[in-house]
Regions:
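ABC ATPase NBD Q-loop/coupling interface
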Residues: 63-78, 229
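Conserved ABC ATPase "signature" region
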Residues: 113-135
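Conserved ABC ATPase signature
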Residues: 139-144, 148
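Catalytic Walker B motif of ABC-type/P-loop ATPase nucleotide-binding domains
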Residues: 165-168
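Helical segment within the ABC ATPase nucleotide-binding domain
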Residues: 180-191
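ABC ATPase "signature
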Residues: 223-224
């Protein structure tokens, strides 16, 4: 089943076109990796999928369907709740771990303390953080290690029960151990969530993704099952990128 359908998507900032005529379908409960050189439009694609592009001064034409319904027909709050995003640099709010995790649920109307406590516990467990920080929930989130901060941001995105999780280079600033922790977590998540991850790490894309899209200069060059993309790319530009000839 396709949870997202992208048809002839073009994205611009003013007169500068970032993506042009991109079409692809995203499979539900699968991990899709977006690869390509810096500046090719990967992150722009993510911010367009949950309409954050408009907050950043961008605009788009074409069509994005979420569960066969145009995303523009949804309220923005609903889209951003349903299609969550985690950024490259960990962005914990400058208050306690606990308040970080109840912020979004309270914004969306959940007030019951027991329910909030359950959300905190469940999301920390999903992010593999519960045993590490359960006794320190009142500690400032900014005092966590870099890897813990990123997992907290992922847990925070899960507190409002998204269906799709967008991740923009979530491991780029992390060491091997923390990267492995997050990859293991994402593989488990795909049972419950659809994941789209931008990564420069081709080995990471091969390890965890079911599908891979290669973008070059704003164009979707190739998209398909990850194993086939890496083993036998159809486009020579894909082959050259994978082999490290450029990018």
């Amino acid at each position: 089943m396709d949870i997202l359908k992208i048809n002839n998507l073009s994205v611009s900032y003013g007169d500068k076109k970032i993506l042009e005529n991109l079409s692809m379908n995203i499979k539900k409960n699968k991990i899709t990796a977006i690869i390509g050189p810096s500046g090719c439009g990967k992150s722009t694609l993510l911010t367009t999928l949950n309409l954050m592009i408009e907050e950043n001064g961008g605009s788009f034409t074409g069509e994005i369907l979420f569960k066969d319904k145009n995303i523009l027909s949804y309220e923005k709050d609903i889209i951003r709740r349903t299609i969550g995003m985690v950024f490259q640099k960990p962005t914990p709010f400058p208050f306690s771990i606990y308040k970080n995790l109840i912020y979004a649920p309270k914004y969306y109307g959940i007030k019951d303390r027991n329910q909030l406590n359950n959300i905190v516990e469940n999301t920390l467990k999903k992010a593999g953080l519960y045993d590490e920080i359960n006794d320190d929930l009142n500690m400032l989130a900014t005092k966590l290690s870099g890897g813990q901060q990123q997992r907290l941001c992922i847990a925070r995105a899960l507190t409002v029960e998204p269906e799709v999780l967008l991740l923009d280079e979530p491991c780029s600033a992390l060491d091997i151990k923390n990267t492995a922790n997050i990859e293991e977590m994402l593989l488990k998540f795909s049972e419950d969530y659809t994941i789209i991850i931008v990564t420069h790490n081709l080995s990471q894309a091969k390890r965890i993704s079911d599908y891979t899209a290669f973008i070059l200069d704003g164009e979707l060059v190739e998209y398909g099952e990850t194993e086939k993309i890496f083993a036998n790319p159809k486009d020579n530009r894909t082959r050259e990128y994978i082999e490290g000839i450029y990018g």
